[in-house]
Amino acid sequence: MRKMVNIGFIKMGNLGMSQVINLIQDEIAAREGITVRVFGTGAKMGPADAADTESFKQWNADFVVMISPNAAAPGPTAAREIWKDVPCIVVSDGPTKKEAREALEQEGFGYIILPVDPLIGAKREFLDPVEMASFNSDAMKVLSSCGVVRLIQEELDRVTEQVASGKSGEDLELPHIFAKPEKCVEHAGFANPYAKAKALAALHMAEKVAQVNFPACFMLKEVEQVCLTAAAGHEIMGAAAILATQAREIEKSNDTVFRQPHAKNGTLLKKVKLYEKPE
């Protein structure tokens, strides 16, 4: 008999991917064999917020997915110390350096590092709730259409299947993935090469956003410089979302959108033509 799998999600702060990561394994709320619970700390991700996640251990997750910006920051680092005795997959936009990623693996953590999940222009002079929501909407358009969502979903399903089959703890094989644009787009299932090229361009643009917004967030002081730079970063993200939409529209016009829904038992089904049944 297959085991019921408890999957915990710890959300500290916010990435674009944070919006849907706990939903992508059960997209129509009909999957059997998994139970999902989420512990979130809102927009903040400090050490005190990390300490609060310990109460989530009472739920006894088989593995947890810890998503936050900058996994090397003090808060996420403190959270990993709390959760080091539970199989844990870190999903973050950094660290991007090989040595830091290898350190995560040596400490027993899985990871999916997403340099394509963009840094928002988080300065009071520029960002209000509407701008924040709009930016995250643009980010999700790229993450969903260009392969990032499917990459993460497939990796989480792979670990889930191991638990369902009886593996646990240190026996689980966790992912160790640095999800550069070229890797992400291969998971999108594009049939048309021009659609794929547009999606790859969108991913490269999303990766560039952090380079533009970082000075606005942490270095620049003059209001005009802060606002101009952050606005430029957000314009890049908006343009990337348009490219991602165009890529999917090409596939729709050819009736070649690749879909991969879950069966009730969690098996991945496939379909391409709109009127086909998934098999």
Swiss-Prot record:
Source organism, top-level taxon: Archaea
Oxidoreductase as UniProt keyword: yes
Q: Name one GO biological process term.
A: methanogenesis, from carbon dioxide
Catalytically driven reaction(s) = 5,10-methylenetetrahydromethanopterin + oxidized coenzyme F420-(gamma-L-Glu)(n) + 2 H(+) = 5,10-methenyl-5,6,7,8-tetrahydromethanopterin + reduced coenzyme F420-(gamma-L-Glu)(n)
* Family recorded in the similarity comment: Belongs to the MTD family.
List, alphabetically, the InterPro entries matched. Answer: MTD (IPR002844), MTD_sf (IPR036080)
To which pathway does this protein belong? Answer: One-carbon metabolism; methanogenesis from CO(2); 5,10-methylene-5,6,7,8-tetrahydromethanopterin from 5,10-methenyl-5,6,7,8-tetrahydromethanopterin (coenzyme F420 route): step 1/1
State which residue ranges cross the membrane: none
Can you name this protein?
F420-dependent methylenetetrahydromethanopterin dehydrogenase
Alphabetical UniProt keywords = Methanogenesis, One-carbon metabolism, Oxidoreductase
**Which EC main class describes this enzyme?**
oxidoreductase
User: What is this protein's function?
Assistant: Catalyzes the reversible reduction of methenyl-H(4)MPT(+) to methylene-H(4)MPT.
Q: Which Gene3D superfamilies match?
A: 6.10.140.120, F420-dependent methylenetetrahydromethanopterin dehydrogenase (MTD)
Q: Name one Pfam family in it.
A: MTD
MF GO annotations: ferredoxin hydrogenase activity; methylenetetrahydromethanopterin dehydrogenase activity
Q: What is its EC number?
A: 1.5.98.1
